[in-house]
Amino acid sequence: MTKENLLQHLQECCDRLFGCSLEMATEKQVYRAVCVAVRELLEDDRRAFVEQTRAEQRKQVYYMSMEFLVGTSLRNNLYNMGLLEPAGEILHDLGFSLESLCALEPDAGLGNGGLGRLASCYMDAATGLNYPVTGFSIRYEFGIFRQKIVDGWQMEFPDNWLEMGDVWLHTRKDDAVEVRFGGQVHEWMDGDKFKTAQTGYQSVIAVPHDLYISGYGSKAVNKLTLWSASMPQSFDMNAFSRGDYVRALEQNTMAEAISKVLYPADNHINGKRLRLRQQYLLVSSSLQSILNEHLKNYHTLDNLADKVAVHINDTHPALCVPELMRLLVDEHDYSWERAWEITCATLSYTNHTVMAEALERWPVDLFREQLPRIYAICQEINRRLMEKLHCVYPNDPGKWEYMAAVTNSEVRMANLCLACCHKINGVSQLHTEILEKTIFRDYYNLDHSRFLNITNGIAYRRWLCQSNPALTGYLQSLIGDGFLNDANALEALLQYRDDPDVLENLQAIKRKNKVRLAAYIAKHNGVNVDPDSIFDVQVKRLHEYKRQLLNVLHILTLYNDIKDHPEKPVYPQTFIFAAKASAGYYLAKQIISLIVAVSNLVNSDPQVQNKLKVVFIEDYKVSLAEIIIPAADLSEQISVAGKEASGTSNMKLMINGAVTLGTLDGANVEIRERVDDENMFLFGMTADEVQALWQRGYDPRQFLTPELDRVLQMLTSGVLGQRFDDVAASLLTPRFGAADSYMTVADFASYKAAKAHAVEVYQDRTRFAKMSLTNIARAGIFSSDRSVEQYAREIWDL
């Protein structure tokens, strides 16, 4: 599209939306006009892409995920469509700035952490690769939450992202579907046919909203279909007429609650009930939509598995298994055997965790109350599974119990997927190995052919090309544009590893990004940080296994060392944290509070503040990550070995030239294979060593050094302005389960040594610049293009 055509389209949109010209419009009106114009261009390309795929009868992929961490869309779409430059020029001519317009756009409140960001990276990659993939999720009215730190404590506020973000959504009320909760199920035989009916249920209407996804240099356009919930009849006139005004609105309010917030706190029964309703709304409405579309094109479901692949992203959409069975058996009159054959061949499952508490299990009473027919189907799946297992593993009730889908008064979501899906994958080599050897071992031994590894990847055009334009431009000047289409072309950078001018220029670009982040920190945190200090970055959701606690305890040892030896030279370091803790996760919120308390202590101490700075940046999200990641020198990837499935922040930081400081966990293992030990800082036990220590009997007190003991006493003495008894207790006593469940104490000495080594190496600026260059050059394998091509070839059969 030419600049003139784009300007004309923008003028038409502004006139249609606001009845005025672009010259007369306010900045917000121009923002909306530009977004609508881009969306309409995507709609045109979408129609052409759909017509093409239908004509070719291409297999469709449907990616089910509870979250998609999309970030902002305006810059991403303009970049992918090749319109970034002409749009910027048009806006400049009108007296506006593309930067200021992009700043008006909120991050879409559709995700939280790595799971949702991975799903979004895969949608971007699939579109760029011309694969027809539709993502399904929920249109959360208030997202996860907006994080504010108030008196050192995380507070959660509604994230009203739709106020400015709704401009990207295309609502299709005519395609709404009904989802049923509760009631009773009646079963009978009609001749030789099994029949059921659900009565006394609550009906919820799911309305689809489409968000279009562009791909770099591609005319393909895919979409996220996001469901919102409401009642069929939103207003009870009879109740209102009786003066019962609250009841008149109550039912609709209860229905709408389903799509209000991502991951409502589930440390109480109402939260659990709401989460289950969310998951079923997502699955039922999506599968109904998929089958309706398929029947429109093929007039039969016999070929469903040949033309449709439904992918379950973690256990949240695991109800796809019984719901697809319900639709095939109850609604479309398939026999159980034929329906099971279709279901198994259609569904695939990615596991994202080895942590038992994250493998969802629902109490039978709650499950049966909300989803009576689905519960009956789960029981039948389990009955047939047990028949099979009794034959395969006779006289082994332990295996039957471990592999059951329904047992011990709970419905196990992961086992439903394992019992059914034709392909099951882990997301890093180590993670998949752990699945096959431990938690999924019995299913793996039953059928090796269903299991495979596909290591995660990132949409590097967003995380490098858009987030770090200075570095991207410099790389283009050195190695050409090939890496824009093929990330592996970054390896050509290695030829400059010993070029002093290139190393100096890379350092200068890094410093500019650090200056930009320092300005953000000064504005939002009121803390002045030195861009010539080491920017040591840990950005990811807050969880004990990710060990932000290990990082902050080490900072306190550095603080104590400076106080004890003020004359000792110390290279300045800035420690940067950003993370959200789940609303109901008390200990994680305590750790955030500890980080904030340590930052207050360190940053206010005149003896220390020119040597150490600690910053917690609130409300971590994609657009904030795009500022932090290009500025990082050190990438903290310090989970206890064997707990992180893969991680993707390690990849984003790597491709921007940060050097990994981490354990051999998740994708760190594969980063090491790419860059070797001399280009990262490794510490800690391996996954096998962690397991061996648990088996021997781990007592954290045996690993407690005097300096760490001193720090833990600081946590309970009040020297930080408050006491952190629960945090200290979690490391030394079994009050919260096993003492030090994630071996923070055991790995502390090794971590401290690795950090000291990293600081020493950083001061050799040439050596560190070579390490940084090597990481950039070797990061191409972690492109989501590679991951999605593997999914397409090895799972979806595209």
Sequence positions of predicted segments:
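A conserved ligand/cofactor-binding region detector
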Residues: M1-L798
